[in-house]
Amino acid sequence: MMKDFIKLKDKNNIVTIEKGELISFKVDGSEYIHQKGSKGWRKSDDEMFPIIGPVSKNNFRVHTKKGDAIQDQHGLLREMDYVLISSDEKTAKFSKKYVKNTKLINSKYPEKSTEEKLFWPFDFTFEKHFYLENNTLKINFIITAEAGMPFMLGYHPAFLLSSSGTDTLVANGKKITLKEIYEVGHNAFPVLNTDKIILENSDRNHLEISTTNFNNFMLWTEVDNMLCIEPISQYTSYTDEKFSEENMRISSGKEEFSITIKVL
């Protein structure tokens, strides 16, 4: 049976993982991850797969060459539990394995959705690997599936802010304020065609968040103590595009993505 909590340690850095969810990243005693139970969001990280965004505008249907799949906001991966593959002092590896057309209970039903069960017409294995070293946490995502499977991928970590409302971000050479992010609301603020964002904390060291293969971010918050900085393979909120494989990435069989969170 998997331990609920795993701690990774390196010098003055401690990462805490709960059943595959990143719930703490402390460097020299300072916390950088939003704490569950605080105002804002009930989680501290999540993965969006194989869909990003609200599928309700598409009647919860995603068109694929194997027929229409039923998905809810941000996909069905979040309805599955991680299994621990291995861990040691500085690394931990988790996976989720899905068998095509398996119906999963939708936790959004009935309060926020009309769909009681979700399914996807492709097999896949989704791995999440954590590596801690020198003030830096790297997380790799490895998706193994049949070649030709359409997908989107997003990672949804929540970072702790100062509660002052004065924390800022820098991306593509431009400064972004929390006020700008609030104004976009639930659609999330797009930061496209970049693989790096700096979070300028007003009360702690800054964070550099860099990625591979995502090439986009979206930013979301409704509170001043937390900010979701989400690497995404594509941004779906402002389009009227149908959720269809024509508008998604297509798997080569094995796809790898990563995020690196570095304390500056």
Feature map (PLM): residue ranges:
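Surface-exposed acidic/polar loop and edge beta-strand patches at domain peripheries
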Residues: 1-136, 149, 160-264
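Asparagine-centered strand-capping/turn motif at beta-strand->loop junctions
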Residues: 141-147
